[in-house]
């Protein structure tokens, strides 16, 4: 009878109603890195590093780039005869120049403050070319004879289209005094130059005067140039050199020229009609007849990700450049399906749901929730309130991280612009150093936040567990695996009250108390039964052993193997 009671009690315990707290799992293979671990598989992750581009030059927000093809910026602005297709250009979004364009300064020489001029162009989107000193106005000088075989056009000697090389006329070079007043509302880009002859004979042949000068003045510029006569190696068939200069003439300001020789005078100037974000990109790519919001020298990027690792130079609404190969933010939970039965590792910030052995693939409508079983059946149900709060929290965290890192990189970007102007030789090293630091910061922040996110999910599971535990109290038993075993019958309505936090503890406490006491009594009774059986077994075993020893002794005495003496 006692055995039957014990068996029934055990069966009753096995079939008790249960509710378990757990978390979502799926078939995801997405992995993230944390401070403590690498390649942690998670249910959801967000890649924040763009690695792809289209390999083409594209329009930027519908505006075409100015692709200089085989011409350099200097060749375009001065008017190299081989760059006639760029005499008048429409508005551009950015400028593309090859690394070594063939059509640069056709007459050998130098362009003063060339990098500074390029920097200026990175803030301009449109020029309008205007004539400021007509070529025909030089009546006392030869304005058409200043040509060179170094600048051919249609097989004949020619010269830059936008400046005039003035030569002596009738064996005389009268002193030039010319002024131009900028009556426009826009700034003007004005270019001029000086010719450095090969020897004194060339000097007098071209300009008559053996000693010459060029003076240029504005409200902000005071320049005096003299030719440097020297024997030089030939470049493009020329031993002479030309040096070009530029300035920005503000509205209502005037530029004054004075010279008695070697003067390369401006004919055209560029009215800056539109300023804005632009760039000069070194690229060999072809135009792709496409549109983008972000362009790099490697190709266009069309992405909403906050970072990319394609090229540090960009134009448009672009992700921020880092040197990383991988930046992935965890947005979901550790993906540990229950069937794997792997022990969860605790994180740096104290993961506290490690007692739950695995996630549920059957729960698909939330991150955290319940699994119940009773006489009416079993099933999964997500806790939507905690899931939504977690989603909002993770989303806000991701956005905060992105905004935080964007602000840092924008600040560095402005510093790089200043370095490019002032410390050109150190710019590359400084740029690499800053990028190394900010890349490290971005990677470290992602690792830290991934650790926090995973522990945040663990904490949410533990909070849900505590919510149930505080409701049930001693009406149920904690099984240690995230589950509770009821001491009373809990139908679907009862289960629902536990899930939504309205469980009525007093309603079930009496039934739970009786069942708890009955189970405790069965345990005590079964323990007493086992103690009696144990004593009986011990006595019986000892008696059987004594009988065997006595029988063996009598047998040995009867056959003489053992001598028995009775005193």
From Swiss-Prot:
Lipid-modified residues, S-palmitoyl cysteine kind: 557, 564, 567
Chief localization: virion
Site, Cleavage: residue positions: 346-347
Bilayer-crossing regions: 532-552
Signal peptide range: 1-16
Pfam families from the UniProt entry: Hemagglutinin
Keyword Secreted in annotation: no
GO cellular component, one term: viral envelope
GO BP annotation list: clathrin-dependent endocytosis of virus by host cell; fusion of virus membrane with host endosome membrane; fusion of virus membrane with host plasma membrane; virion attachment to host cell
Gene Ontology MF terms: host cell surface receptor binding
Similarity comment text for this entry: Belongs to the influenza viruses hemagglutinin family.
Chain's role: Binds to sialic acid-containing receptors on the cell surface, bringing about the attachment of the virus particle to the cell. This attachment induces virion internalization either through clathrin-dependent endocytosis or through clathrin- and caveolin-independent pathway. Plays a major role in the determination of host range restriction and virulence. Class I viral fusion protein. Responsible for penetration of the virus into the cell cytoplasm by mediating the fusion of the membrane of the endocytosed virus particle with the endosomal membrane.
Official protein name in the record: Hemagglutinin
Species of provenance: Influenza A virus (strain A/Chicken/Hong Kong/31.2/2002 H5N1 genotype X1)
Lineage: Viruses, Riboviria, Orthornavirae, Negarnaviricota, Polyploviricotina
Gene giving rise to this polypeptide: HA
């Amino acid at each position: 009878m006692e055995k039957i009671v014990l068996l029934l009690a055990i069966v009753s315990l096995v079939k008790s109603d249960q509710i378990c707290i757990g978390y979502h799992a799926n078939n995801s293979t997405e992995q993230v890195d944390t401070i403590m671990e690498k390649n942690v598989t998670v249910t959801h992750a967000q890649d924040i590093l763009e690695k792809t581009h289209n390999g083409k030059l594209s329009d930027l927000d519908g505006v075409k780039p100015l692709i200089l093809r085989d011409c350099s910026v200097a060749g375009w602005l001065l008017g190299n005869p081989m760059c006639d297709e760029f005499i008048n250009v429409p508005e551009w979004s950015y400028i593309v120049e090859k690394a070594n364009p063939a059509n640069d300064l056709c007459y050998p020489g130098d362009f003063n403050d060339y990098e500074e001029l390029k920097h200026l162009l990175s803030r301009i989107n449109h020029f309008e070319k205007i004539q400021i000193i007509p070529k025909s106005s030089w009546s006392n000088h030869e304005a058409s004879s200043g040509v060179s075989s170094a600048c051919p056009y249609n097989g004949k000697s020619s010269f830059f289209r936008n400046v005039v090389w003035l030569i002596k006329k009738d064996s005389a070079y009268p002193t030039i005094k010319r002024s131009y007043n900028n009556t426009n509302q826009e700034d003007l880009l004005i270019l001029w130059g000086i010719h450095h002859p090969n020897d004194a004979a060339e000097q007098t042949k071209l300009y008559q005067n053996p000693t010459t000068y060029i003076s240029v003045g504005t409200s902000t510029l005071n320049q005096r140039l003299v030719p440097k006569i020297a024997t030089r190696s030939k470049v493009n068939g020329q031993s002479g050199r030309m040096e070009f200069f530029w300035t920005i003439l503000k509205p209502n300001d005037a530029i004054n020229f004075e010279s008695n020789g070697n003067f390369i005078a401006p004919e055209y100037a560029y009215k800056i009609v539109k300023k804005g974000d632009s760039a000069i990109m070194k690229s060999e790519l072809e135009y792709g007849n496409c549109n983008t919001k972000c362009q790099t020298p490697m190709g266009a990027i069309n992405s909403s990700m906050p970072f990319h690792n394609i090229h540090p130079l960009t134009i448009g609404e672009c992700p921020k450049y880092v040197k990383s190969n991988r930046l992935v933010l965890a947005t979901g939970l550790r993906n540990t399906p229950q069937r794997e039965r792997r022990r969860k590792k605790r994180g740096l910030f104290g993961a506290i749901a490690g007692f739950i052995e695995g996630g549920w693939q059957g729960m698909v409508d939330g991150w955290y929730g319940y699994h119940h079983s009773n006489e009416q059946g079993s099933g999964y149900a997500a806790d939507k309130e905690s899931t939504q709060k977690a989603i909002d929290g993770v989303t806000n965290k991701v956005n905060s991280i992105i905004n935080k890192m964007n602000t840092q990189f924008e600040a560095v970007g402005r510093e790089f612009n200043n370095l490019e102007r002032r410390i050109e030789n150190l710019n590359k090293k400084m740029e690499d150093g800053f990028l190394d630091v900010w890349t490290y910061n971005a990677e470290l922040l992602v690792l830290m936040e991934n650790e926090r996110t995973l522990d945040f999910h663990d904490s949410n599971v533990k909070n849900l567990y505590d919510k149930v535990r505080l409701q049930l109290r001693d009406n149920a038993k904690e099984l240690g695996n995230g589950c509770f075993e009821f001491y009373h019958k809990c139908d679907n309505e009862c289960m629902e009250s536990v899930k939504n936090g309205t469980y009525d503890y007093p309603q079930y406490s009496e039934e739970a108390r009786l069942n708890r006491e009955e189970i405790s009594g069965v345990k005590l009774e079964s323990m007493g039964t086992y103690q009696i059986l144990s004593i009986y077994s011990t006595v019986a075993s000892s008696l059987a052993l004594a009988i065997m020893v006595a029988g063996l002794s009598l047998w040995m005495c009867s056959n003489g193997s053992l001598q028995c003496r009775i005193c």
